[in-house]
């Protein structure tokens, strides 16, 4: 009789009944809780989504998951998967049940036991959080705002919960590290909403808190304001315009204030313009204990060292709890950020985002040309200016050595490698180089429109920002290609970017991740994006914990990265001293020597073509022992489709599956 009960029968007849007996109601039970979207595959397909059979919740808090097995199975059969999912979802308890027996596993102390009945929601909540004060309970049980079609992703909820836990534990400096494109502003909005609704503040008064949201650019501040639109009545921008409206007095009649920190520390190199310098000084007019919480967006950019842009702001408002948001993991060049805030309370990596299907996977085309390493003096070339015989490194290009022919050659190659209407961002050495590349693109473009390729740099001002808005609008086809230098490394929310082109040496892991983040956002019909690397930057900046394991030739990355940063710094200093030289290539031949395509595997690991084939062969070996077994699988249509689906879930894309079909059809 027991064998007649399927897993669904077991859930309905036995597990649900036991939950009801322990005071669990439908509001607290989520069945078949899917928490990932499944890695994006070619052809608009996705790998299998991860889900828990049951998620148990109470007062907005995820407390436990249940893995259900059919009545005739051993309840422990589902435990390992349950533990894996519970760790991902940050829930402390796992239950595995066949309807008759219940096994409870406590992840916090790595121990388990059989129990007679499920604990009630309140019992489980108290076991996790213990005795909490009234204000702490309010914070823990305050839900986020319900917005239809915008339910929080699992990692966004965890990030918010981790910050709430840190606040409850009186931690004054908090850091969140989440990859670009994962919705840090969404997290900030929902966190602020919970704090406002729970009426949390540093003095435990019955009033809403005062929160300052800091950005380093006016455009990013305005973008954040847009995200907070559902509670716009609580929000105000600290700006010259708003203060002018307020008869020259600082704005105090709000709960969430948005501003920029760009030049408070008088770091003139980081000032975008005089307006931003003036706006940032308005902070000094607020009392030091005015704010309860300060959120610093992209905190790796301002710098936590004593001369950093936001350091002075935070020291002035040291009374406030301070939350830093960053997209970059701990590395040498942003160590000050981590020393200031401490270790991140929660990390969500690019690798995880791609595996879960919330970020778009990518492939890299490393293009090696005759000038990839540098230029060797050739008397047959037309040289304008003084140039000694010798070898000049590629990092000197467009600083004091100008090669118009080479820019033409690169532009032509870019247009050959991309689809003409695929949105593309080209990162150049500087603003002048961005202008030169635009000129070269215009020379060879097949689409004859003035706005097909545009330059977006700080020199372009409002015109450039208007072009950027059009580029980010998914309903607009033009502009298609943007050329820029540093301006577009952050703050570009363009979901349909298909190509990132690297024409400039990159000096740090932080900058590299910011640039790559321009392409990772998910968009309908976008199965992957492509990095076209003309300078070898992708060889230097793979990060095993963040992006996946290193391939063999990248193992000297740390030393190379250090050398690269030092070399770029040295090159910039030398360029200031040297006179510029323009070289019209007459004798030097321009050609592509090699294009190496690197795939990114299901686990985020970068794979060369050879390694990708080895990966396929290895995957095949997991499903059959010999050729006879493969013939047996392939001869049955249902088995064949199951086999191909299993391969797809392991990250084998449709093109590879098509090749496999052809190979098998000929061979079998």
Please report, for each region that a protein language model flagged, where it lies by residue.
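ATP-dependent helicase/translocase motor core
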Residues: 1-210, 215, 219, 223-234, ...
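Conserved RecA-like helicase motor-core motifs
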Residues: 26-31, 232-246, 445-462
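Conserved RecA-like P-loop NTPase helicase motor core
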Residues: 71-72, 262-265, 300-301, 453-555
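Long, largely alpha-helical accessory region at the distal end of helicase-like NTP-driven motors
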Residues: 146-149, 162-163, 395-402, 406, ...
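Conserved C-terminal RecA-like helicase domain
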Residues: 255, 393-483
């Amino acid at each position: 009789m027991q064998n007649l009960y399927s897993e669904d029968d077991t859930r309905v007849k036995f597990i649900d009944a036991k939950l009801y007996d322990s005071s669990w109601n439908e509001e607290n039970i989520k069945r078949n809780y899917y928490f990932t979207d499944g890695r994006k595959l070619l052809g608009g397909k996705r790998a299998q989504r991860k889900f828990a059979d049951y998620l148990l919740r109470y007062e907005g808090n995820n407390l436990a998951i249940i893995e259900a097995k059919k009545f005739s199975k051993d309840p422990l059969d589902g435990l390992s998967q349950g533990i894996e999912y519970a760790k991902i979802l940050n829930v402390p308890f796992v239950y595995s049940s066949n309807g008759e027996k219940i096994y409870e596993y406590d992840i916090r102390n790595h121990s388990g036991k059989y129990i007679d009945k499920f604990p009630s929601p309140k019992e489980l909540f108290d076991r996790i959080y213990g005795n909490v004060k009234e204000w702490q309970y309010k914070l823990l049980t305050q839900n986020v705002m319900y917005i239809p079609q915008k339910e929080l992703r699992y990692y966004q909820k965890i990030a918010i919960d981790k910050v709430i836990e840190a606040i409850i534990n009186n931690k004054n400096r908090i850091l969140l590290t989440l990859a670009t494109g994962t919705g840090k502003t969404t997290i900030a909005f929902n966190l602020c909403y919970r704090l406002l609704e729970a009426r949390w503040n540093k003095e435990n008064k019955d009033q809403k808190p005062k929160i300052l949201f800091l950005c380093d650019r006016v455009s990013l501040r305005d973008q954040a304001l847009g995200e907070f639109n559902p509670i716009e009545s609580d929000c105000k921008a600290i700006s010259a315009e708003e203060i002018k409206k307020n008869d020259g007095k600082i704005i105090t009649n709000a709960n969430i204030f948005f501003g920029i920190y760009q030049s408070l520390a008088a770091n003139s190199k980081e000032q975008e313009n005089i307006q931003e310098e003036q706006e940032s000084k308005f902070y000094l007019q607020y009392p030091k204990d005015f704010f309860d919480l300060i959120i610093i967006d992209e905190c790796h950019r301002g710098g936590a060292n004593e001369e950093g842009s936001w350091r002075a702001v935070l020291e002035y408002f040291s009374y406030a709890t301070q939350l830093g948001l960053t997209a970059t993991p701990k590395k040498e060049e942003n160590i000050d950020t981590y020393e200031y805030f401490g270790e991140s309370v929660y990390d969500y990596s690019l690798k995880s985002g791609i595996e879960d299907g919330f970020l778009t996977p990518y492939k890299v085309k490393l293009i090696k040309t005759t000038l990839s390493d540098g230029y060797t003096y050739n008397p047959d070339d037309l040289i304008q200016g003084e140039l000694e015989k010798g070898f000049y490194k590629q990092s000197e290009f467009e600083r004091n050595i100008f090669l118009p022919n080479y820019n033409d050659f690169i532009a032509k190659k870019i247009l050959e490698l991309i689809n003409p209407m695929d949105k593309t961002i080209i990162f150049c050495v500087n603003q002048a180089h961005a202008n030169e590349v635009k000129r070269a693109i215009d020379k060879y473009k097949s689409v004859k429109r003035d706005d097909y390729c545009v330059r977006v740099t700080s020199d372009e001002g409002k015109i450039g920002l208007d072009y950027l808005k059009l580029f980010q609008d998914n309903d607009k086809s033009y502009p298609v290609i943007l050329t820029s230098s540093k301006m577009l490394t952050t703050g570009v929310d363009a979901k349909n970017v298909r190509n990132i082109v690297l024409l400039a040496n990159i000096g740090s892991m932080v900058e590299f991740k910011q640039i790559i983040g321009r392409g990772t956002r998910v968009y309908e019909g976008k199965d992957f994006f492509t990095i076209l690397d003309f300078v070898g930057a992708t060889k230097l900046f793979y990060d095993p914990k963040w992006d996946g394991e290193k391939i063999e030739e990248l193992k000297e990355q740390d030393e190379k990265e250090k050398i690269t940063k030092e070399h770029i710094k040295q090159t910039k200093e030398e360029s200031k001293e040297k006179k510029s030289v323009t070289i019209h290539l007459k004798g030097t031949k321009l050609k592509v020597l090699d294009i190496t395509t690197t795939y990114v595997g299901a686990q985020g690991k970068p794979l060369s073509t050879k390694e990708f084939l080895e990966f396929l062969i290895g995957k095949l070996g997991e499903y059959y022992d010999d050729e006879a077994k493969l013939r047996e699988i392939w001869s049955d249509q249902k088995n064949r489709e199951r086999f191909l689906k299993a391969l797809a879930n392991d990250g084998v894309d449709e093109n590879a599956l098509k090749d496999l079909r052809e190979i098998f059809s000929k061979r079998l």
